[in-house]
Amino acid sequence: MNPIAFHVGNLAIRWYGVVISIGAALGLLLAMYNCKIREVSYDEFINMFLIAFPSAIIGARLYYVIFEFEDYRDNLINIFNIRQGGLAIHGGIIFGVLAVYIYLKYRKESFFEYVDVAAPSIILGQAIGRWGNFFNSEAHGGPVTKEFISKFPQFIQNGMFIEGTYYHPTFLYESIWNFIVCIFLVYLLKKTKKKGIVFMAYIGLYSLGRFFIEGLRTDSLYLGSIRVAQLISVLGIILSIFFIYNIIKKEKRY
């Protein structure tokens, strides 16, 4: 799989960056539609995005480097080279959400009002962004048989044939799951006006899919013998259930 999309002079533009950019652009288009549904300012959303997106990239890289520091100890300058991958989505979510919270607090805007609108766009960006892993031949699962991989389209088979071995296309599993969650979140955004429900549904549903898919991957970040992504996913599921339960419970009181 060729990770280079095209060249600008001597500069190689990698598919990884192209795919992330496409995901961000389509996420913004979806947000334009969802802002109308919830009657929130799209201009304010754009301002929020301009703070959240770079914060998320920094957080995703920092999170990855912390757990893989041995790979960078002898060449620290490579920490700043993200063109070949090395972004951990959980770090991106944490830093992005924190940046948004600080910004909206400063602007005296409702945090949940805006992150509810953002949730479908975030998961859409993640669904598309996983294809960047495909072009980088990363974030795949363990070895599989030719018979198993033959059930997938030919270009997936070709991309998952790495150094003489076929691998689980876990990037594809997560991409499909994220697209399904995105559709559900857009539906939920139309059906409920309760602040926080859509965003917490995103946290819970993404975490649910990631927990199971992570178990198939061969490049997980570890804390001792524990896969970090699975640990964070469990916490995300618990937080989501707790928050949504309390919203529903509060509604029944009144």
UniProtKB/Swiss-Prot annotation:
Compartments in which it is found: Cell membrane
Keyword presence, Membrane: yes
Transmembrane spans: 11-31, 49-69, 84-104, 109-129, 169-189, 196-216, 228-248
Annotated keywords: Cell membrane, Membrane, Transferase, Transmembrane, Transmembrane helix
GO CC term, one of those recorded: plasma membrane
Membrane topology: Multi-pass membrane protein
Family matches, as InterPro entries: Lgt
GO MF, one example: phosphatidylglycerol-prolipoprotein diacylglyceryl transferase activity
Keyword Transmembrane helix on entry: yes
GO annotation, biological process: lipoprotein biosynthetic process
Positions annotated to bind a 1,2-diacyl-sn-glycero-3-phospho-(1'-sn-glycerol): R130
Family to which the UniProt record says this protein belongs: Belongs to the Lgt family.
Stated role: Catalyzes the transfer of the diacylglyceryl group from phosphatidylglycerol to the sulfhydryl group of the N-terminal cysteine of a prolipoprotein, the first step in the formation of mature lipoproteins.
Protein name, as recorded: Phosphatidylglycerol--prolipoprotein diacylglyceryl transferase
